[in-house]
């Protein structure tokens, strides 16, 4: 016997969260809970404003229609990426095909303060990896901050994310302030320039490895080995079903590229599932999941070690 419930939720964000020039005051999303006999599976559907093609309202409409079809015996996945991802996670939990083992070693987001980062990294076992957002301020300032961090912490490897913010000139201004001796400790820089060709040129000219992120979701993207490209960053909420995520990871690994499972600012429930996906598909790579502290609460499932209050399922709005 099948049953299901869909929950709508909204979590207040910390004041300083800005995505593509818009301030994100709340994180809005949906959960789907599927039950079959004694088994239960959960999934999160939370399109990311400014990044997802679909809105939260569109996702809700598609999700509710899919749930009704599933209750009637139809299991075909929806095409909308955020809904496909959440539904496939719920189905995987329901059939016990999403392993329980999780990788909670999130690469910490750094605000540029070396002392703060040293404290965050002190308890991190193994490789010291952190992430810095660049492209929000002047490129020269970004270069100086990155150089300072690499100089202050000799065993640090940095992941940088520019979100296509730079022109070729700004990319060169950034690189000018990063000591060439430190550049190989930049694990990768995600999408430095507005076009892929400019990003490729940046990698060739600076020796700083790059990673594809937004490019993966463009219709003309193909997985090929390229000079200067070291990694792909896979955001499942923006990608689609678990099967599509797995296909992308396998395609990257076949080329010798690092594949990083990364957050789209999901709630704690979604983040714990991403940690499980990372342990399953990319066991040797630290995922990019250090986004929970951007929110003011956890929901339904706790992230280990987080002190944020937890909103239980009974407090969420039911849609069925």
From Swiss-Prot:
GO terms for biological process, alphabetical: menaquinone biosynthetic process
Cofactor(s) annotated in UniProt: Mg(2+)
Presence of the UniProt keyword Transit peptide in the record: no
Recorded GO MF terms: hydro-lyase activity; magnesium ion binding; O-succinylbenzoate synthase activity
Reactions mediated catalytically: (1R,6R)-6-hydroxy-2-succinyl-cyclohexa-2,4-diene-1-carboxylate = 2-succinylbenzoate + H2O
Pfam families named among the record's database cross-references: MenC_N, MR_MLE_C
Pathway: Quinol/quinone metabolism; 1,4-dihydroxy-2-naphthoate biosynthesis; 1,4-dihydroxy-2-naphthoate from chorismate: step 4/7; Quinol/quinone metabolism; menaquinone biosynthesis
Function: Converts 2-succinyl-6-hydroxy-2,4-cyclohexadiene-1-carboxylate (SHCHC) to 2-succinylbenzoate (OSB). Does not show detectable N-acylamino acid racemase (NAAAR) activity with N-acetyl-S-methionine as substrate.
Protein name from the UniProt record: o-succinylbenzoate synthase
Source species of the chain: Escherichia coli (strain K12)
Taxonomic classification: Bacteria, Pseudomonadati, Pseudomonadota, Gammaproteobacteria, Enterobacterales
Gene assigned in the entry: menC
């Amino acid at each position: 016997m099948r049953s299901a419930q869909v929950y709508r939720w909204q979590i207040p964000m910390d004041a300083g969260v800005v995505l593509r020039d818009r301030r994100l005051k709340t994180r809005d999303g949906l959960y789907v809970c599927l039950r079959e006999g004694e088994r239960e599976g959960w999934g999160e559907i939370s399109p990311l404003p400014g990044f997802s093609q679909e809105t939260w309202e569109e996702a809700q409409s598609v999700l509710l229609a899919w749930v009704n079809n599933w209750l009637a015996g139809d299991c075909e996945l929806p095409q909308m990426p955020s809904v496909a991802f959440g539904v496939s996670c719920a189905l995987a939990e329901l059939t016990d095909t999403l392993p329980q083992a999780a990788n909670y070693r999130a690469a910490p987001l750094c605000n540029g303060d070396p002392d703060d980062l040293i404290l965050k990294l002190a308890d991190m076992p193994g490789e010291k990896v952190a992430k810095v957002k660049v492209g929000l301020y002047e490129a020269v300032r970004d270069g100086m901050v990155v150089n300072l961090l690499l100089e202050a912490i000799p065993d640090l490897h940095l992941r940088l994310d520019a979100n296509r913010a730079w022109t070729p000139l700004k990319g060169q201004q950034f690189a000018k302030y990063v000591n060439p001796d430190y550049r190989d400790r930049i694990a990768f820089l995600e999408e430095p320039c507005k076009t892929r060709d400019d990003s490729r040129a940046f990698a060739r000219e600076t020796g700083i490895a790059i990673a594809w992120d937004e490019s993966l979701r463009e219709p003309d993207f193909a997985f090929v080995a390229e000079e200067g490209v070291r990694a792909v960053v896979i955001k499942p909420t923006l990608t689609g079903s678990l099967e599509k995520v797995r296909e992308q990871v396998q395609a990257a690994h076949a080329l010798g590229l690092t594949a990083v499972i990364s957050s789209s600012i999901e709630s704690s429930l979604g983040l714990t599932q991403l940690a499980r996906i990372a342990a399953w598909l990319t066991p040797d790579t630290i995922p990019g999941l250090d986004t929970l502290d951007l929110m003011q609460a956890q929901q339904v499932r706790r992230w280990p070690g987080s002190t944020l209050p937890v909103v239980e399922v009974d407090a969420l709005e039911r849609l069925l």
